[in-house]
Amino acid sequence: MAGMASDGTQYDPRQFDTKMNAILGEEGEETFYTNYDEVCDSFDAMELQPDLLRGIYAYGFEKPSAIQQRGIIPFCKGLDVIQQAQSGTGKTATFCSGVLQQLDISLVQCQALVLAPTRELAQQIEKVMRALGDYLGVKAQACVGGTSVREDQRVLQSGVHVVVGTPGRVFDLLRRQSLRADAIKMFVLDEADEMLSRGFKDQIYDIFQLLPSKVQVGVFSATMPPEALEITRKFMNKPVRILVKRDELTLEGIKQFYVNVDKEEWKLETLCDLYETLAITQSVIFVNTRRKVDWLTDKMRSRDHTVSATHGDMDQNTRDIIMREFRSGSSRVLITTDLLARGIDVQQVSLVINFDLPTQPENYLHRIGRSGRFGRKGVAINFMTSEDERMMADIQRFYNVVVEELPSNVADLL
C-alpha cells in the first residue's frame, strides 16, 4: 500500500516542499510561511466589536492560538486569506470571528457563505458561528444534504446573516434563488484541500460564478497540498498566506504507536484485546470503507463489545443521533471512515486507532487530530500489516516523526 497522491501518483514529500516553496516564493526559518506580519497576542488587542468579544470569552477562549493571533485580523480587514494550521488549533473560530466582525446585523440578508465537505462539519461550524455571535444576535443556518429543502427555504425566506453548508445543497438553493447572492460579501472554504479536490472542485467553481465579483475569499485547512494552492489562484486576489511548514505538521502532545499484525484478518483479535483499554476513555476507530465500518461493528457487537458507528451511507438523522450520543459520552467507542476525520470536534477523545492506515499521508493528520485537541494529551495507535509498511514510512517521512511500537502498558498512557 504505497503512499499515493490524490491524482494517483506516488507521494514524494520532497516534491511537496519544492512545489510549496515555488508557490509561496519564499523560505524561512519561521514556523509559519506568511506574507503578513501582524500578530496579536490577545483578543482585546484585535479591535473586535464588544459583543463579539463577549461571545469569544463566553465560548471559553482566553488567549488566541497561534493561527488566531495571525489569522483573525487580515480576515477582519476584508483581505483574501489562505490559512493552514493543525487540527484542533482554532481555525473555525478564526474565520467565524472574521465573518462576525464584518456583518451588518441590521441587514438580515445572507452576507457570508461558508462551505464544508461534510454535513457534520457544516452543522458544527454553524453552532460555533451562533455561539460566538450570540450577543450580536446573528442568524445562521446550516444548509446540508439529507435534510428538508423546504425547511431551508423557509428559514432563508425569513432572513439569515450567514449560511453554512455543503456544496450540493448550497448550489441547489442558489440555482433556485431560494438563497440570494446579492448581499454575500464573504465566501469561506473550510477543509479546503478536500473542497478543491476533484470531487468538489467543479461545484465550488459553479457556486463562485454565482457570487458577487468582489466577494472576499477565505480558504482554511489543516493540510494544503500545492495542487490545492494552485487552484486557489483562480479565484483569489493577492491573498494573505499563513501556512505552517510541513515539518511543523505533526501533532504535539499526541503519542503515536504502531502494532504489527501479521495478517489483515488478525486485526480484529488485536482490537478485541485492546477493547478494555479503549473503553476507559473515548476512542475513535478509523477504517477505509463504509462496508468495513458495518463489518467491524457487527463483529465487535457479536463479541459483546459496545460500539457505535457512523458513515456517509447512513441517513442524516441517524448520524446526528449517533454523534450526539458520542459527544455526551453515553457511547464511548466510535467506528467511522474519514468522514469524521474532517474537523469534527469531540473534545473528550483521547485515543484514535487506525484499524486501516489512511490512503494518503495528509489524512493521517486529520484523523489523529481527533485526540489531544487544543493541546490536550492523546494517543494514536496504528495497526500495521506488511502491506502497510510503505505507507507508514511515507507518513513518518511526511511529518518528520518516528512512530514507535506500542508498549505493553498502553492503559498507563491514557
From Swiss-Prot:
> Which residues does the UniProt record annotate as the domain Helicase ATP-binding?
72-242
Subcellular location as annotated = Cytoplasm
Principal location listed in the UniProt entry = cytoplasm
N-acetylalanine: residues carrying this PTM:
A2
Chain positions found as Phosphoserine: S106
Where in the sequence is the signal peptide annotated? none
Reactions catalysed according to its record: ATP + H2O = ADP + phosphate + H(+)
Q: What keywords does the record list, in alphabetical order?
A: Acetylation, ATP-binding, Cytoplasm, Helicase, Hydrolase, Initiation factor, Nucleotide-binding, Phosphoprotein, Protein biosynthesis, RNA-binding
* Role noted for this protein: ATP-dependent RNA helicase which is a subunit of the eIF4F complex involved in cap recognition and is required for mRNA binding to ribosome. In the current model of translation initiation, eIF4A unwinds RNA secondary structures in the 5'-UTR of mRNAs which is necessary to allow efficient binding of the small ribosomal subunit, and subsequent scanning for the initiator codon.
Family according to the record: Belongs to the DEAD box helicase family. eIF4A subfamily.
| UniProt remark on domains | The Q motif is unique to and characteristic of the DEAD box family of RNA helicases and controls ATP binding and hydrolysis.
Name of protein: Eukaryotic initiation factor 4A-3
Recorded source organism is Arabidopsis thaliana (Mouse-ear cress)
